[in-house]
Every structure is written in C-alpha cells, then in structure tokens.
Amino acid sequence: MKNTDTAEALPQSKLNLDELTPTIPHISFDSEDGQQFFWGEDFHLIIESLSKKYGDIYSVETAKGPIVALNGYQYVREALVAQNDVFNVRADYEILQIAPQKHFLELEAGEQWQVHRKVFANAMREYFSTRWDQIETWMTTEVNDIAAVWKAQGDVSFDPNREVSLKLASFLHKVMFDDRFGEFEVSIFDEKSLSWLPNGFINSTRHELMPTDLQERYYQQYGDAIEKFSSNLNGLDQYVSFNVNRRKEDYVAGEYRDLCDYLFAANDSVDDATKAGLNIGEKEIVVGSLTQVAGAGGGVGAFAMRWALLYLAAFPEYQARVQKELDEVVGDDEVPLNKHKADLPYTQAFIAEVLRHCSITSMPAANYATSKDTLLDGYFIPEGTPLVINNYSITRDETLWENPDEFIPERFLDDNGELSKKQQGKAFPFGLGQRRCLGELFGKYIIHTLFAQLAHKFEFSIPEGKQVNLKAISGVFLVPEEVDIKAKSRL
C-alpha cells in the first residue's frame, strides 16, 4: 500500500525517524491537486481520486500545517480500531471548539468523552429497554400521516423530503420530549435545515484551513453554505435548549417521561468534582446529547430515506423483489414491524446496499487528530496531526466489494438467500471503532421501519422522460442532489 512516488515529507517530529520510515506523499497547497482539495465541489470524490494518484495515505499542506488523509479499509481500520487510543482526539480547529458543536459527544476526547459516552449510553439503554412497542406505535402513526399526504396529492412527482423530515422530527420530538409536533412546530419546520449541515461543515473547515489572504475569496464562493451551517446548527441548539428548559420546570427525579428525563438523571449522577474537573455538565450531557439525537437521527434518517426511495424508483426490478417479500411476510392486513425484520432478508439487503452505494457517511462528522506520535503501516505521523478519514473509500474498496460502483442488493445475501453477516461486517454506515455512532441500533430501526412501511404502501417510479440522478451533494453525510419521484398507492 506504500506509494513510492516522489513527494515532500511531513514536517519533522521530535523523533528523528527520517532514515527508518518511508515518506508520506505530500501535496502542496499551490499545486493543482492542492487547489482541487481546497476549491473543488465534490470533496468525497476529490480525496478518493487523490488516493488513486498518491496512495491510500497522503498529506495536504494547509495554512495550519499538514493534514493526513487515510483511505481504504486497511488504513481506516488500522487507525480507528487497532490504534483507537491514538487516532481519537479532536483536531485543533476553531470550528470544532465553538458552541454548540463543542458540547457534542462526537467532538470530545479523553476522560470527558469517556464520562459523557458512558452516561449517555446508559440513558439511551434504560429509555429504550421497555419502550419498543410504544416506539413502533409512534413511528407507524407518523408513517400513516406521510401516506395520507402522498395519497392525496395524486399522480404528481415530488421530493419526499418535506413529509419524511417533518414526521421523523415529530417522532424524535416524542422520544425526546414525550410529545409529537403541534401546529406551531409544523408551521416553523424547515425540512431543508439539516441538509445544509454536512456540506456546510466541510466548507467551514476548508475556509479555516485556507491562508488568510484567500479566505475572503473562498467565502465569496462558499459563504452561503458556511452561513447556513452556522445558523441551522444554532437553530437546532436553540430548539433543543428551549424544550430542555421547558421539561426541567416539572422534572421529578426518579420519574421518567422521556429521553430528556433520563439524561437529567444521567447529569445528576455525575458528581460536582468530576463535572468541574472535566468541564462537563447539563449543556453537554442533556442539551448536547439531545441535539445529536435530533440532528443525526433526523438528518441521517431523512437522508437515508430519500436515497432509499430514489433507489426503489431507479431500480424497479429490485423494488418488485422487496415488495414481493413484504407482501409474503407481512400481508395486506399488517404493517412491517420489528418482529418481521428477521424474515425480510432481501429488504434488509436492499437497505444495506443503498447505504453502501450512496456512501451516506462519507467521513466522520468531525476531524480527529493523533494524540501521540505513531506509526501507521510504517509511516510516521506526529502527535497532533489532523486527519481526514475517507469512509467513502471503504464503499469503493475493490478488496472488499466486487464491482463496487454497481448497485447489487444481492451482494448482502449468502448462498441460502439469508442476510450475510460477513458482508455486513464490511460496511460501516454508522462508523467503526470507539467513535462508532452511539445511536446505531436506534438509527437502524428508524431506517428499516420507515423504509419497510413506505415500500409496503407505495410503488415508486421516476417520472416519464426524467433521467435518474444519483449524484450527491458532498459533505460528511452525502445528501441526494435531487429527488423527483412518483408514489402510487399499493394498498
């Protein structure tokens, strides 16, 4: 995997390993490739294309020093799993150290991260352990509302984002604050707000890494995305903070109405000395955690559903197989629920292939850095080196996937037509290693249930004369550039 092309070396560390380690291929800022890295539109495709030229590990010059890009399953797994104690601190970027994002679990490190993760995980586990039947009822109610709107609009094409995002947000509001959206929440809801965050983060980070004399020019090109990232993230924080304060007014310790109450209890379980020493408290444990539930749960759930419905419409032969399985297992008188999931291997395989092929999580939602000097496949990486982790490259890694650019749901089935655990073990839509998404189980439930119920109720198609468009808007999560489909009721 080492690249022998002539390239500049990383700046010297306090350890003199020049004669012992190979040189990491380096891309200067002023080079054509460096300019593409900073100015190009499709960032996930750019870093992937650079790996074809420089190898699966390379560095890029920035105004704040070199940043190392890791590509391919071997390097990403080595960093995030085998050396998870090294590749696990937040990069020293201003964009990661300001509110509200600095309060997110994803952007913490060390003992602060360990304490936050432990109490957050316990709260999630305790909340969900006895509520799955209720949660399924809540989800089905929201899906029925989506179906009513789509049936009423008739034979017109549409983007499913409005109803899917709105009803998913309402469902999560119920989980977090024990109430569905009311008329006021519906009236102010902006279904596009979360879609701006993935691309806005990438551009906010690149803006910060630009030389000062070029930042104004960069802002002229990408300022709209940067501003919407900031305003929508702050809006999400304000929404969560308002509801946390409202719930706190009548919170009674030991009485649990919703996830918010479990997080109040989690915050109370951390002693004052620990809170002071680690700079952790209600803003992190309650508000930060719920903001991630609302943002990641609502955003990724909606992004995944737009992709999944688009793929159903784009590949009618696969849609027919999904619906045949749903009809045989569920029938007309029931709706797909968690109890049916094990008997729906093709439906699960279709979802898994959608998440792989669209590469929904193209990179972690934050830039990490090395906590100490380390070697990766013989390459020396100094302490404090920021990283770009290219998850997209895993979905296109030819050592893992045959014909990775093709959409083939059957790749996730074994010879007996059952879901292949081996193939599932190669796909990481929720990340891998210590930083793997804490809400993975809940996220998978949301995506599977939404998809299965909507695919059971509707047949989706591309409007006549319209070309299939599977292009993504680049970001830490990949969002469909355009979804324009029709939905015909099946039941």
From Swiss-Prot:
Enzyme Commission numbers on file: 1.14.19.-
Binding site for heme: C437
GO MF term set: heme binding; iron ion binding; steroid 17-alpha-monooxygenase activity
Cofactors required: heme
Keywords per UniProt: Heme, Iron, Metal-binding, Oxidoreductase
Gene3D superfamilies (alphabetical): Cytochrome P450 (1.10.630.10)
GO biological process, one term: progesterone metabolic process
Free-text disruption phenotype from the record: Deletion of the gene abolishes formation of the dimeric compounds 3,3',5,5'-tetrabromo-2,2'-biphenyldiol, hexabromo-2,2'-bipyrrole and the hybrid bromophenol-bromopyrrole pentabromopseudilin, whereas the monomers 2,4-dibromophenol, 2,4,6-tribromophenol and 2,3,4-tribromopyrrole can still be produced.
Pfam family, one: p450
Family according to the record: Belongs to the cytochrome P450 family.
Free-text function comment from the UniProt entry: Cytochrome P450 protein involved in the biosynthesis of polybrominated aromatic organic compounds. In the presence of ferredoxin, ferredoxin reductase and NADH, catalyzes the coupling of bromophenols and bromopyrroles, forming various polybrominated biphenyls and hydroxylated polybrominated diphenyl ethers (OH-BDE). Can also mediate the heterocoupling of 3,5-dibromocatechol. Can also use chlorinated phenolic substrates. 2,3,4-tribromopyrrole could be the physiological substrate.
Name assigned to this protein: Polybrominated aromatic compounds synthase
The organism of origin for this protein: Pseudoalteromonas luteoviolacea (strain 2ta16)
Lineage summary: Bacteria, Pseudomonadati, Pseudomonadota, Gammaproteobacteria, Alteromonadales
